[in-house]
């Protein structure tokens, strides 16, 4: 075996591994399990990014739905779930037939398991607000994050917003539908849905553009008309937890929740009327075993649910010490594979 050949293999494998992070910082998909990928079951080159809301729905870009072909939701544990329905905002195009409010929603038949939650924000945003965009663009199987800053609203079409992405971390194909997320009151909140990127031909500076949640809030509440909540939650060592949920109802609602092997001991959800897009909390207590918090008959938060290995991904492993940076195969196993290949060729 010649050393130069082995060196070339090592170099090529390192390059392949680094490709998974060239568009941003790799993040642990299992820790951001409300981010999902929308796939075409027969063409793996067609995909978009989406965010789970309200148990079995996901919000994404309208053109991901309109262009057709995406019929599978891929979860963080690599499970593939068929889509059961799709919607596009009624104002997807304007009076001139141009693409306008580029937001869509898809659903699956049953609620899926996820702990991480990003709430929907309909507030006006300020210039230079730090934000992140997490998507699968350019990597497919690993989730990456681009750090950005909110730039401005379109001068005429106020529903379109822009973000400065910089040169080192920027969006690319496959990031369509990703959430633009800010940190607000200790929560991650989505202010817009990613639609695409722009490059200034004079300065070569990159920017991203998206559609605000504020501009499609009626579409969201008409489609969902329910609670936005994590479907999984755990109690602490004392058997207690505080769970934050958000109303995506069409009208004001009041608390109707109850527990099975879970006791509601307080929280702001008990205080009265809850308006659309407002958040509230439930304080719960349990004996540490599995139970359920029922927001309604069909909207359930599983408490202390055992993690089941579905045979894909991390099998629900929430350990953040993984060294494979989002699912990329480690260098040494790949190198050994290359050595074995060379031996076969000799």
Label every PLM stretch briefly.
Residues 20-31, 41-44, 69-114:
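Conserved catalytic-core segment of clan PA serine endopeptidases
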Residues 100-168, 206, 210-214:
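Chymotrypsin/trypsin-fold serine protease catalytic domain
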């Amino acid at each position: 075996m010649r050393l130069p050949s082995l060196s070339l293999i090592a170099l090529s494998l390192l390059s392949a591994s680094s490709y998974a992070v060239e568009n941003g910082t790799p993040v642990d998909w299992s820790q951001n399990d409300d981010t999902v990928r929308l796939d075409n079951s027969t063409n793996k080159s067609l995909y978009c990014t989406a965010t789970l809301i309200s148990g079995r729905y996901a919000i994404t870009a309208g053109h991901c739905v309109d262009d057709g072909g995406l019929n599978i939701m891929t979860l963080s544990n690599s499970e593939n779930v068929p889509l059961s329905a799709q919607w596009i905002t009624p104002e997807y195009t304007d009076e001139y037939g141009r693409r306008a409010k580029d937001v869509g929603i898809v659903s699956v038949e049953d609620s899926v398991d996820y702990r991480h939650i990003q709430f929907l924000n309909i507030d006006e945003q300020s210039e230079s607000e730090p934000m992140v965009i997490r998507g699968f663009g350019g990597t497919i199987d690993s989730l990456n994050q681009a750090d950005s800053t909110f730039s401005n609203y379109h001068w005429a079409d106020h529903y379109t917003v822009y973000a400065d992405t910089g040169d080192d971390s920027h969006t690319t194909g496959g990031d369509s539908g990703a959430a633009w997320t800010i940190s607000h009151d200790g929560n991650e909140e989505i202010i817009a849905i990613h639609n695409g990127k722009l490059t200034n031909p004079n300065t070569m500076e990159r920017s991203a553009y998206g559609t605000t949640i504020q501009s499609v809030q009626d579409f969201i509440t008409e489609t969902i008309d329910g609670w936005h909540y994590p479907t999984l939650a755990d109690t602490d060592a004392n058997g207690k937890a505080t769970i934050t949920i958000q109303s995506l109802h069409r009208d004001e609602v009041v608390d109707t929740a109850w527990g099975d092997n879970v006791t509601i001991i307080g929280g702001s959800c008990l205080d009265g009327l809850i308006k659309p897009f407002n958040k509230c909390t439930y304080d719960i207590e349990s004996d540490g075993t599995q139970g359920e918090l029922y927001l309604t008959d069909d909207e359930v938060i599983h408490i202390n649910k055992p993690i089941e290995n579905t045979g894909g991904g991390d099998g629900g492993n929430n350990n953040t010490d993984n060294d494979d940076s989002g699912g990329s195969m480690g260098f040494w196993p790949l190198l050994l594979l290359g050595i074995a290949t060379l031996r076969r060729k000799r």
